Amino acid sequence: MLKNANEKWQKAIAQFVSVRDSVPETGVDFYINAPGMHDDNTISLCIEAVLGWAISAEGFVNLAWQTCPDTKQIDEKDYKSTIGKIKFLCKVNDINYGSLSWRDSLSQLFELRNSLVHFKVPITYVGFSFAPKYQQDFSDTNMLKYQKSVISLINDLGKKLNMDVSFTSGNYELFYYDE
């Protein structure tokens, strides 16, 4: 999933355009790189990347949970969210969750994934010069933060648990099985 998400992201960013936005409080214009307003193909690629990164993070956390001697006997269902499991894994492995530079971006990734999957908040366009929320969510700045947060989670937690995380550098060969 991580490989697929990263590939979708590479295809998406190649199609990004400069999108005018403005600061709501002041009206000062600025530009973001994001999918075009009606570019369904690029928006779909961004959605696939976001979903893939979220699934990759959740899958890795579940694997880490089963690998960690302090958690593998605990029913993971007692933790209602992936973030809850991450916090507990950090705690039992002497990782200061509060100091992790990627934690807010990872939370934002899961919030975006939830809004895409469960569609509880309608996508709206507010104002004349403001970029819609989805263009802001899928901006290159935010997408790079989401991607980095997943890779950092895997590297930080995986290394602490002596897991092979070499695939985060783009070498996915270990996942292929030949008969």
Question: Residues of each region from the PLM?
Answer:
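Charged alpha-helical initiation segments
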Residues: 1-46, 175-178
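A structural signal for well-ordered alpha-helices, especially hydrophobic packing surfaces
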Residues: 57-61, 113-120, 154
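Amphipathic, Lys/Arg-enriched alpha-helical patches that create a basic surface
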Residues: 127-179
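Terminal alpha-helical segments
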Residues: 1-11, 45, 126, 136-147
